[in-house]
Amino acid sequence: MSTSITLEGFYRKAGMLIPWFMSAALVLFIVGVYLGFFVCPIEARQGNSYRIIFIHIPAAWLAMSLYLLMAVASIVGLLKNSRLAFILAQAMAPTGALMGFIALFSGAFWGRPTWGTYWVW
């Protein structure tokens, strides 16, 4: 009895789950944006510029998490000689790069009103 997942089986199961995950992500995104930008009070020292943090921190965490998962998937792919692990690692790369880009520039846009400069390092 084999416990490995074939590519065809993975694509079939992933295809069935995509609409559910996309719906949940959209609902959570809308709720998060509403709470972060309209419900939270104005911060005493930073004013409204602190609201950028509601985009910056999740993007940075997601980028780091995706890069860690890419490394794990690549190691699994090397150890188990699994094409699926390499496909998963390759699929995570564009999203990790996008989240890294968002984190980098949202941090700069937060730094400008907070520190008076886009970059401190």
Predicted regions and their residues:
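Hydrophobic cores of alpha-helical transmembrane segments in multi-pass integral membrane proteins
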Residues: 2-10, 15-43, 47-121
